[in-house]
Amino acid sequence: MAVGTTTGELRELTDEELTDKLRESKEELFNLRFQMATGQLANNRRLRVVRQEIARLYTVLRERELGLAAGPGGEDS
């Protein structure tokens, strides 16, 4: 997942793309935590960035679920 993906960019994605990105981010977070536990992680900041990215993804998905935001193209998903 790209570093610095904004919420606006995430809102332009479809639900399937969002769930794919969420899965990828969770896998990356798992790998980063494993590296941290074994002392191989050089960049601790990446953990925080990935957690924030996951939170943004959940926020966009929840907005759509509640009907607060439309899907890509202005249509409700």
From Swiss-Prot:
The keyword Ribonucleoprotein belongs to this UniProt entry's keyword annotation: yes
Coiled-coil segments on the chain, per record: none
Entry keyword annotation includes ATP-binding: no
GO molecular-function terms, A-Z: structural constituent of ribosome
Keywords noted in UniProt: Ribonucleoprotein, Ribosomal protein
GO CC term, one of those recorded: cytosolic large ribosomal subunit
GO biological process assignments: translation
HAMAP family membership: Ribosomal_uL29
Similarity annotation: Belongs to the universal ribosomal protein uL29 family.
Name listed for the protein in its UniProt record: Large ribosomal subunit protein uL29
